[in-house]
UniProtKB/Swiss-Prot annotation:
The protein's assembly and partners: Binds ribosomal protein uS19.
Keyword annotations from UniProtKB, A to Z: Chaperone, Cytoplasm, Ribosome biogenesis, rRNA processing
Compartments reported by the entry: Cytoplasm
Domain PRC barrel: 96-168
Family: Belongs to the RimM family.
Biological process per Gene Ontology, one example term: ribosomal small subunit biogenesis
Record's protein name: Ribosome maturation factor RimM
Native source species: Streptococcus agalactiae serotype V (strain ATCC BAA-611 / 2603 V/R)
Length: 172
């Protein structure tokens, strides 16, 4: 079974078994709702166990969660640095034009018939996602995921069609 990252445990929160999680999902309320089961992976990306969410709340840039059956800091301190993942069969269906990051990363990027590079990472700096395109012999291209730039995402052919706006590629 394949798993996908939804957050990283960065620290404990108080003494009552809560953890600070840096979320990497667009579905926070769904992923961290009470009763949701997530997989816990260690720093070496090895499966540790399935855990059930007992509670969730937001605090600043973090999601504060508590696992069922772990109600003291001593129960959870060992999980700092671990990753929370969701099983593939728990992924939600998306609307047309919406994609999971794992579907986008690795796609070839074309402008017209010219291959620009391959998407290696997705950043979330603010209003829209930014796709990082790895190019041969050039610096990475930061591609905003906005309609005038990203014209088509074709998952079946593993390609993205773009139109680079003036000033977007500083190496031209």
């Amino acid at each position: 079974m394949e798993y996908f990252n939804v957050g990283k445990i960065v620290n404990t929160q108080g003494l009552q078994g809560e953890m600070r999680v840096l979320s990497v999902t667009d579905f926070v309320e769904e992923r961290f709702k009470k009763g949701q089961v997530l997989a816990l992976f260690d720093e070496k990306n090895q499966f540790v166990m399935d855990i059930e969410i007992a509670s969730h709340r937001k605090q600043k840039n973090f999601d504060i969660i508590k696992f069922k059956g772990m109600y003291h800091i001593n129960d959870i301190e060992k999980y700092k640095g671990f990753t929370l993942k969701v099983a593939e069969d728990q992924l939600s269906d998306l609307k047309d034009g919406e994609f999971y990051y794992h579907e986008i990363i690795g796609l070839d990027v074309y402008e017209g018939e010219e291959l620009i590079g391959k998407i290696k990472e997705i950043l979330q700096p603010g209003a829209n996602d930014v796709w990082v395109v790895e190019r041969h012999g050039k610096r990475d291209l930061l591609l905003p995921y906005i309609p005038p730039v990203v014209l088509e995402v074709d998952l079946s052919n593993q390609r993205v069609q773009v139109e680079l706006m003036e000033g977007l590629d500083d190496e031209d």
